[in-house]
């Protein structure tokens, strides 16, 4: 089983979210989507991210732009980096993923595309309403649902859980309960781990 801890506000997570789905399908693996708030992780265990954003190393920042563009091209995705609003408050979008449960994938896909592909501010209710309409979700039920305390509590619990298990960002991916991987570029290693597990179970 794969657990995919994610926040739609991360470009590398957009890539991994897109790229892991055909891998899971190909190998017949089960995947559990675990929405989180990456800002909550940074505040707890990785606050240096904020300093790096304030004072980026120019050469590294320039290469990161190229690296992201290369990966996006490879995945067939459009990514605008940085978006007009960056970082973005993704809390309502991620609560939406929690509220939708097992039906979250079309919504999460549209949130990723709206933010990273279309440069829309996913913190805004009007943008989220537009996404709901696109994927066939009742807007009123959506906004009522993301206001439920149980939904808020689950998002917080997921975020605390990934930190407790050693995570420090998004995407954090587990194969089994303890084999942790971080980032889009670890997917070849995840493939190998899944194949090893398949072989040992045979």
Language model segments and positions:
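C-terminal cap of thioredoxin/glutaredoxin-like
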Residues: 2-3, 7-29, 34, 102, ...
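Structural alpha/beta surface segment adjacent to cysteine/selenocysteine redox centers
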Residues: 16-118
